[in-house]
Amino acid sequence: MSHRKYEAPRHGHLGFLPRKRAASVRGRVKSFPKDDQTKPVALTSFLGYKAGMSTIVRDLDRPGSKFHKREVVEAVTVVDTPPIVVVGVVGYVETPRGLRSLTTVWAEHLSDEVKRRFYKNWYKSKKKAFTKYSAKYAENGAQVDRELARIKKYASVVRVLVHTQVRKTPLSQKKAHLAEIQLNGGSVSDKVDWAKEHFEKTVAVDSVFEQNEMIDVVAVTKGHGFEGVTHRWGTKKLPRKTHRGLRKVACIGAWHPAHVMWSVARAGQRGYHHRTSINHKVYRVGKGDDEANAATEFDRTKKTITPMGGFVHYGAINNDFVILKGSIPGTRKRVVTLRKSLYTNTSRKALEEVTLKWIDTASKFGKGRFQTPAEKHAFLGTLKKDL
């Protein structure tokens, strides 16, 4: 027999244990960027829905690279980002054990979209959520003003409660996603005033992110169910003549300690994990009401970001959207949280100015020969189905 090694590096990363299903489908932001009071008040994250992927062409601006000033083709992800609605504000107090919630103030009127989030069965419920709370505004809102004054006096961190407008997306879901987003910039009083002014009002994505910015994406990955140890951990397949299976771990531990260690690779859940993907460059923040939001300086074709036939398993995008470089966690239709980067990225890729030359809007189902219906009609002529 040839030389055989009796040791090897372990298979699989132990830094993401336990590999189990996420508690919620929405990506939860556990850390926000550091606050800078010299800047104006602004949100630090946003909610959107993953629509699908496409392809772009641009000139690389990277001196020293062999592809400098040459065209490159890159994969991008399109995130549908209808405006979010501000419905509340939360004040946090710093304690020796971390942040503690001081109080929460809700807006006077909440839509049924967000009220559904508080019910397990909306149709069988009495739909009385927040009826008593909204009565606080009847008496000139004195009690609400006192709670806001408490936040201004004692709180050190201010976060707003926002929800998505899921009815503006192609999704059949009626229940909005509710999230807590930190406000950065200005004093605590300025943050509370900003939150109160935006109660029951919408905030667009272009007021949070801009082109060429590096952001993070927090989402739940695509689920794959119960998976074997070879695919789940990448362990080596055993020799052909191995007794009772090849895609297994031959030794799962010593006699003593008389239990299986937590670090041993085992079969189980793969996917549907909560993950944060960092440093995605924003290639474009598009407007939904622009009929040429997929046009560029080099491609003057009047077309929208929605490809022919719509995004597969999603549909058409009629709202504002964000184009991000590369792929992001999650499946189509999944809610994703876009967060400002926690640190200032000074790499060449982060500082590079991106100018898109062409955005692919061909059908994502099949070969995709045509970019617009007009181009298809000009090539094929009048079809029998159009008569």
UniProtKB/Swiss-Prot annotation:
<dbReference type="InterPro" id="IPR000597">
    <property type="entry name" value="Ribosomal_uL3"/>
</dbReference>
<comment type="similarity">
    <text>Belongs to the universal ribosomal protein uL3 family.</text>
</comment>
<keyword id="KW-0963">Cytoplasm</keyword>
<protein>
    <recommendedName>
        <fullName>Large ribosomal subunit protein uL3</fullName>
    </recommendedName>
</protein>
<dbReference type="GO" id="GO:0022625">
    <property type="term" value="C:cytosolic large ribosomal subunit"/>
</dbReference>
<dbReference type="GO" id="GO:0006412">
    <property type="term" value="P:translation"/>
</dbReference>
<dbReference type="InterPro" id="IPR044892">
    <property type="entry name" value="Ribosomal_L3_dom_3_arc_sf"/>
</dbReference>
<keyword id="KW-0687">Ribonucleoprotein</keyword>
<dbReference type="InterPro" id="IPR009000">
    <property type="entry name" value="Transl_B-barrel_sf"/>
</dbReference>
<dbReference type="InterPro" id="IPR019926">
    <property type="entry name" value="Ribosomal_uL3_CS"/>
</dbReference>
<dbReference type="InterPro" id="IPR045077">
    <property type="entry name" value="L3_arc_euk"/>
</dbReference>
<dbReference type="Pfam" id="PF00297">
    <property type="entry name" value="Ribosomal_L3"/>
</dbReference>
<dbReference type="GO" id="GO:0003723">
    <property type="term" value="F:RNA binding"/>
</dbReference>
<dbReference type="GO" id="GO:0003735">
    <property type="term" value="F:structural constituent of ribosome"/>
</dbReference>
<keyword id="KW-0689">Ribosomal protein</keyword>
